[in-house]
From Swiss-Prot:
ATP binds at G47, L48, S49, G50, G51, I52, D53, S54, T203, K232, T254. This is NH(3)-dependent NAD(+) synthetase. It catalyses: deamido-NAD(+) + NH4(+) + ATP = AMP + diphosphate + NAD(+) + H(+). Deamido-NAD(+) binds at R183, K216, D223. The gene is nadE. Catalyzes the ATP-dependent amidation of deamido-NAD to form NAD. Uses ammonia as a nitrogen source. The keyword Electron transport does not apply. Keywords: ATP-binding, Ligase, Magnesium, Metal-binding, NAD, Nucleotide-binding, Plasmid.
């Protein structure tokens, strides 16, 4: 890291977020072992998506408890990208863990997940049906002040895409139906955790955890979350140290939730993860917008817009981090 001689402080850059990967891996492994002892659990269960976060989490879990005590699940559904299953299997083979496929498509169909979602979409696009695809996108936070308004993108069977503004009722309805996917996956994870006497491992990184990029009682539910303190760029650095296949390390982060291909950037975050990390770190550590802007290649006004978006998401998603609220504390179990 570079030091400013005149101010005796660090020059902020991407290097500021660098970690000692070996030491950090050892620290997380020790933490996982201690948490499992406290929970009185024998091993770890997690969903394996083929993304960087779950892949790194598998590698850390194997180091902590051994491959025979790690149980992984592939849980595709009707809208899943087949690449996710292929890459997930690659990770499972790389680290020698037991992994099974639990196709949740029929369960979601039986619960009306897809039908409920499509009914809300048809309020805007009456012809929406078989052969169509869709996703939700947000406006670019760098291009204006205020909230990031979500839009619906639909693609007809001929491949023509149309972008539409959604009234709140349609947005909430689509999201509510889609959240069934994450909650169904978590039910299956806990089924296997219960039968094995294992703990469920959650895989959010710091950016996702801070910004509420998870579903309450869905992918947000877990017994341990070993990488929630790491910025996304730090997770990628750890992936290299842990031997995550290069193909996965090169893959852009995706949601793999909607039927149209969708990046995390267009769905939720204002910027690519590496620049979001710099903005979040700068905000968390009291750096100036000018310092962050030079590191992230953004203007001061743009940094301030990103910070406003971070603050808005923290406020809007605070309830996701809360447990059930009691009228009066039950002191004996506090």
């Amino acid at each position: 890291m570079n030091i400013r001689p005149d101010q005796n402080r660090l020059v902020f850059s991407a290097d500021t977020l660098k970690i000692d990967e070996a030491a950090e891996a050892d620290r997380i492994v020790a933490g996982l072992r201690a948490q499992l002892r406290s929970l009185r659990k024998r091993g770890l269960v997690l969903g394996l998506s083929g993304g960087i976060d779950s892949s790194v989490s598998v590698a850390l879990a194997v180091r902590a408890v051994g491959a025979k005590n790690v149980f992984c699940l592939f849980m595709p559904e009707n809208d899943s990208d087949p690449e996710s299953l292929r890459l997930g299997r690659l990770v499972a083979e790389t680290f020698g863990v037991e992994a099974v496929v639990e196709d949740i498509g029929p369960t979601l169909d039986a619960m009306g997940c897809y039908q409920r979602r499509d009914a809300f979409i048809r309020e805007l696009v009456p012809d929406y049906g078989p052969g169509w695809a869709s996703k939700i996108v947000i406006a670019n936070a760098l291009e204006g002040d205020g909230y990031n308004i979500s839009s619906l993108v639909v693609q007809d069977p001929e491949g023509k895409q149309t972008k539409l503004r959604m009234p709140p009722s349609v947005y909430l309805g689509i999201v509510a139906a889609t959240n069934m996917k994450q909650r169904t996956r978590k039910q299956i994870e806990y089924y296997h955790a219960d039968r094995l006497n294992f703990a469920v491992l959650g895989t959010p990184n710091r950016l996702e955890y801070d910004q509420g990029f998870f579903v309450k009682n869905g992918d947000g539910a877990a017994d341990v979350k070993p990488i929630a303190h790491l910025y996304k760029s730090q997770v990628y650095a750890l992936a290299g140290h842990l031997g995550i296949p290069e193909e996965i390390r090169r893959r852009p982060p995706t949601t793999d939730t909607y039927s149209l291909e969708q990046t995390q950037e267009e769905f939720y975050f204002s910027l690519p993860y590496d620049r979001m990390d710099l903005c979040l770190f700068g905000l968390n550590n009291g750096l100036s917008a000018d310092e962050v802007g030079r590191a992230a290649n953004l203007g001061v006004a743009q940094v301030k817009r990103v910070w406003a978006d971070i603050a808005a998401k923290r406020k809007a998603t605070r309830y996701l981090h809360l447990g059930p609220q009691l009228v009066q504390p039950v002191e004996e179990i506090e």
